[in-house]
């Protein structure tokens, strides 16, 4: 394949491939398809049915993408019919200039499979140009002595049309002195000349005017005219004579402009003015006059422009030598241009694939191109080659047409595009070459799965993070392009509950950012694992998974919680009893606290914030153990209070406080009075609520009393006097062994008085007797449930009727004397009957109270947890404290039927006055405050 661009180093395989590829190129090796059309054909005119001439059906036109290509595209193919249509204006004179034969070469390209067919369109000339004279006014001179038959040369007209449409004839208007003769030269050109018919007489007529008309051979013919003015001069009988009738010279096309080409010379045997010769171009094409210049005096011809053998191979001109007397003669000059290897080969891409799939098999055609060299002979023979380290190679089809095909596997991820440089070199000396680079883009297929940046991810997230905050980001890459490389992220697995994953975390499908959907709690969830998936959008889709472990870090968000000492169910505080004889270092109690945090945030330390007696107790910094720092002194109070702070090790640290109530006593009996008289801090808001409730209760009680009084009065009127006989002494008294003789059965009128303190505990006032009783009076039964009747006569009942319906004021002091106070078991004075129960009742009552306290503390309903009248006992005092710890309890017991509170012995030691008899009873704590 002489002009092949194939790579010579692979000659062996190509000898095998050539017979296989020959059928593929066979259509391009056949004779070209020829069409002939006239120039100036209208746009859209049909040149011929190209599809039919190629043997293609109408369906193949669009299916195989039939099209034509050329340097200057004057034609197009109808996509429906396959007709070859005129696309642009076709002017033969502009396209082919002075060439006699005008042809346009096209390449018809079809695909599936890819083939090329040669098409030649011959452009026929039409008479679209009229003849034209260079000068509309022609001035000639002739001597009157000129003999008949003397000829005067005229400038010919020019017509760019050829053949029959070129200039056919000349004519002039009739004149007795001149006639027109047409001279035909060797190349068929026609040149007009005037011939003198008879002698001139200058004295008779000094000038002659003629009209010269040039006609072409078109149908209808076109014409042009020029005015000839002939002046008659005196005689000049010797015309100039050239040294040669024809000058011929060969010039290299590389001759620079302005170089001397040829000098013509003529001689005249006349003398004087008649011997002075001037040189002019005659009967020369306008393009030739532009290419050359002629010195009128010397006859030197020079080139004005560079020669180009590929455009014009030969120039022909006529040079006229005219003497001063008007006689002239002509010679012919022929200049031939010699071809030089001055044109580099051209590479013209006729078809190029936009993209090549990276899985394309070897041998796939990706581009079609051709080469052209305007030089002739060996200077115009071209061979092509490309680089050897790329997976492409070149096959030559025919007539300098080539195919660029794949020659190996393609991988877009390694090489997304190839810059293929085609080098064309001619066989001139020296050889010239040119190159053309084309870029081939490799189209992507989804052949790569996403790859994560890390094999696994571990992130640390502090608890209490804001919901919606980003806690991590995973990133995957996919070297594919477009949708094949577009990655979406999702959560596919987790060690959390399947339905709870979305409530804990979410992942952005676009960025891979993992967001927390809620605030994490280290104490509930310390770590969890996710499996994230990166999936591309290719077809089929490819994916990859990665594990993400989230470690929830601890924050100091939980304050220490004190387990001991704890408050009772009703809010009362426990007391710890310390023996009075406790030595320094004695373990009194231990503050127990926990912290839900971990690490340093849960490292607790204990500190004393406030102590009623500083220096009496010590507190373990880490253990929380409360020990005595020294022995109890005589001046130290029996009741001590410690305010302990428990701090954790977080930053900033959190703390909790606990209040320890410590009582120095050797037995429970000593601390019972203190438990009853604990001060209770007052709250202004609670006091306001208390007063409101008391006021409401008083109004209700007054209303109830009014209703009861009205009912009692109505019943009193309706009952007979015999009914009241029951109130006589002894009528209703029941005696028997059940009740000791000190007591009588009866009913006491009572009322409830409810007080609410800020601690939330409720205080119940015991029953209040409506009639004041003396310690030496017995109780008798009355039919009316409203009063207790003293044993007097009937006149007392009638004289004091208000005692039945009203409540007497309480005694100013219900304290017992020292003789009346009960002692230890078995020490009761037998003379004070009717005041205290016997010792058996005393023992059973205390045991029942302690057991009830322990039982109620266990189920959260204790009434002995420190409220009013409960002695401040709690569950922890129940089981371990028995009667042996309480030798005497009666000094702290409220006496039913009295508004006064029996003060304890400590109250007397403090010298406090007894409560007044106004009927308003306060809690012991409030009395101390006021």
UniProtKB/Swiss-Prot annotation:
Residues 31-133, 134-242, 243-347, 348-452, 453-562, 570-675 form the Cadherin domain. Keywords: Calcium, Cell adhesion, Cell membrane, Glycoprotein, Membrane, Repeat, Signal, Transmembrane, Transmembrane helix. Gene3D superfamilies: Cadherins. Its main location: membrane. It is a single-pass type I membrane protein. Disulfide bonds: none annotated. GO terms for biological process: cell adhesion; homophilic cell adhesion via plasma membrane adhesion molecules; nervous system development. This is Protocadherin gamma-B6.
